[in-house]
Amino acid sequence: MKNVFFAAFFGAACCLSGCRQEAATPATGEHYAFAEEMFRKVWDMYRVPEYGLFSEYYPNSYRPDVNYFDDGAKSTQEVSFLWPMDGVFTSAVALAEVDPVKYGCYVDSMVIAVEQYYDDGRMPAGYQAYPVRMGKVDRYYDDNGLVGL
């Protein structure tokens, strides 16, 4: 029951950076195979299908109290903050660069997922830390920067 979500995708993205190839060349090699395996595991084990989003914990029923909020400890939400979910998005984009046919649908899914964090009810409009449907929460410049990148 460890929070390996971010570490898994950071590792997968790092592995992909070493196997970048021309678009017409099929990807091969152990780095690409590892990136695909990690992507598949995170997609299968951390995805919360009813929202099209991801959990920060496995199993998804694990809900530790988090104590890094100014107003005290809270129980974790059913889905992740925006920034780790953006790591999944980045991994999907990196894999789609190598194999657009296989991973293009994942990128499309992630575009829809990220939009769930978009808050246009406050000015200026921007992406908030949790999906809008789960309530109004803080918006951070670095989250919005990650989405922009």
What do the PLM-derived regions correspond to, one by one?
Residues 21-134:
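Low-complexity, Ser/Thr/Pro/Gly-enriched N-terminal "stalk/linker" regions
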Residues 9, 16, 89, 93, ...:
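Generic hydrophobic secondary-structure signal
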Residues 1-27:
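Bacterial Sec-dependent N-terminal signal peptides
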